[in-house]
């Protein structure tokens, strides 16, 4: 397939600027929009998360549940909860719960 995207153009309050994909920390789906967290800011973009995900490197960006995608480069640590599903702690302090499928995938990736 095509090479993963390395840059996107985001609009924010009337300005448009390039955002390098490696700066994206995580993203969350919000109906037809996606909230992208990067550089300590949150950007609301008018594109569905699945559409964006299809253009990203799957070794770096992991879909942890239906409405969240994380960049492993910005994960501080992960810890299993009582249901043995992983809680993902991001470097900015955000905690995102991984579903069973993602928890299994992440465990398999661990060496």
Language model: regions and residue ranges:
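Basic, polyanion-interacting recognition surfaces, primarily
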Residues: 1-111
């Amino acid at each position: 397939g095509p090479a993963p995207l390395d840059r996107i153009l985001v609009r924010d309050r009337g300005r448009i600027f390039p955002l390098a994909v490696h700066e994206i920390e995580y993203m969350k789906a919000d109906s037809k929009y996606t909230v992208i967290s990067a550089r300590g800011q949150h950007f609301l973009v008018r594109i569905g998360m699945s559409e964006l995900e299809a253009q990203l490197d799957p070794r770096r960006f992991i879909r942890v549940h239906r409405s969240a995608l994380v960049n492993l480069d910005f994960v501080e640590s992960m810890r299993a909860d009582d249901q043995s599903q992983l809680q993902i702690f991001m470097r900015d302090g955000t905690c995102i719960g991984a579903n069973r499928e993602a928890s299994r995938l992440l465990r398999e990736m661990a060496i």
